[in-house]
């Protein structure tokens, strides 16, 4: 199955990746800043601790460690995350498509994983959206099962897919650099 990003011309892919990466970093910075009040001894990873709490008792402990303002910041962070998930998933998806293209051109291993992993990034964003819904439900309606369990399940899938996409993108980037270096060496040996 083709990915929509495969239709983007190569030169435009580079520009699009740069823009998406810069937006991802900017939003990550803003969300980390918003998340500072969420870091407590009970929730050392802030919102991520909340995502992975996994049961009602742990969620109650985390919510009790946050004052009213921290809970408002958590809500703001979860709302902003809906924009963030569109940006980060598209950035990593495009990087996966580009990595697959680069690996195919160099005849390295696993070029065909680029497209499925690109789709996987948008799947990660869907899991992120469900996770956020579960967390927003908890913040607005109270702590009830199965919402903490749903959040942890979705966060686990999300982070796994993101990690696979980032590792594959790095692999493709290393392959691209190696191929570029090899071409330079060939050009130098044939003046």
Predicted ranges, named:
Residues 2-77:
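Interfacial loop at the N-terminal end of multi-pass membrane proteins
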Residues 76-99, 166:
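Hydrophobic alpha-helical transmembrane segments
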Residues 96-104, 174-178:
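Structural signal for the C-terminal ends of transmembrane alpha-helices
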Residues 14-21, 107-123:
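Interfacial segments of alpha-helical transmembrane regions
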Residues 119-174:
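Alpha-helical transmembrane segments of multi-pass integral membrane proteins
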């Amino acid at each position: 199955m083709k990915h929509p990003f495969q239709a983007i011309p190569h030169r435009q892919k580079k520009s699009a990746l740069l823009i998406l990466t810069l937006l991802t970093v900017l939003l990550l910075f803003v969300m980390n800043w918003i998340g500072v009040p969420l870091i407590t001894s009970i929730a050392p990873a802030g919102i991520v601790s909340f995502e992975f709490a996994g049961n009602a008792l742990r969620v109650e402990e985390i919510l009790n460690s946050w004052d009213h303002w921290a809970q408002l910041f958590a809500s703001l962070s979860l709302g902003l995350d809906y924009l963030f998930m569109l940006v980060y998933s598209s950035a990593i998806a495009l990087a996966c498509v580009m990595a697959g293209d680069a690996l195919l051109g160099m005849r390295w291993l696993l070029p065909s994983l680029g497209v499925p992993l690109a789709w996987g990034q948008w799947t990660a964003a869907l899991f992120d959206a469900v996770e956020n819904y579960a967390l927003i439900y908890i913040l607005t309606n109270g702590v009830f099962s199965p919402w903490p369990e749903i959040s942890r399940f979705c966060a686990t899938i999300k982070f796994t897919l993101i990690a696979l996409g980032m590792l594959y993108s790095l692999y493709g980037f290393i392959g691209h650099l190696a191929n570029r270096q090899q071409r330079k060496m060939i050009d130098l040996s044939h003046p």
